[in-house]
Amino acid sequence: GEFAAAEARKALRRGLHVMIFSDNVPLSQERELKEEARRRSRLVMGPDCGTAIINGVPLAFANRVRRGDIGVIGASGTGIQEVTSLISEAGGGISHAIGVGGRDLSQAVGGISTHMAIDALDADPATRRIVLISKPPHPNVAGAVLARVGQSTKPFTVCFLGADSAELPANARFASTLRAAAEDALGGLELGAGFALSPRKSHASGRIVGLFSGGTLCTEAQLVLARHGRRVASNVPAPGSCPLDPDDGRCDRIIDLGADDFTRGRPHPMLDPSARDEMLRRALGDPGVAVVLLDVVIGCGAHADPAGHAATVLAEVEPARIAVVASVTGTEADPQSRPRQIATLQGAGVQVAPSNAQAAELALTLAGG
């Protein structure tokens, strides 16, 4: 983080587009970099940009997806991964997926890279429609972005997780989940149509504990649970959730293990899934917990076998009344192979849903609604 802005500035002055994986870059420096990039007609992806796919080439944490005519712009790494993977596995394809960094749609940055990415994909003849993904943007920034969307002749899908369905231009549709965004981009195709929410076996009602490596997947799970009236607490609370309180044993706990407070001084859990081992063991042994909810994120840059690692931990625990539910974000073409990861989890007794949103819905059913 300390030297990222200086190195990015050097790259811009050499006429290059820049992707900044590093975080901990001050907001003021991010704004300055993006303003300079705009003057030079160059794009800054990031800081804290963990995912992009440019001309079919995955960068950082990204998945091997089919080429196609759907462009994606995201202030969200695992949000991009979930949507592009769902589209690809359903037979669609991606022209480009452009990460802009999680703070681009803040008031301080003003959506500079998002506007430039929209301009780029709008002018790209290989891109037929565009998906926007973000946690709730600042209202003024959202208004400006949606005004730019309305100037396009291309159809847009807008997935601002946790935001209200804003008044959208005529060429845009709102999606409340990442799965819904992928479905809309595919022309309304229903994903996971054969998946039943009815549990294989009933479990006692109780709390849900979610242990996530993906920040946006963690946010989406919180929103699904809160929408159904659950009391949800998190270290990164989404709209409708509250901050974690160690003394409150009544709330569902949905934890983002990739947040700064967990990754300072150690690898991200997508690189080292052992980051959630101890919490997983504790949750499985907690009599007040009915369901443990996990994400498994694969692809370029990720751990070689996250499902196998989780299965090893689960094998330490006697088959229990606690249900374990997961989804796998990724594709069959990824090095870890999505079907192989699913089979490993199912072999360990995990109930695997077709998407992160459906995994949260299944957890709700298993925990008694």
Predicted segments, located by residue:
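Catalytic-core regions of core metabolic enzymes
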Residues: 1-369
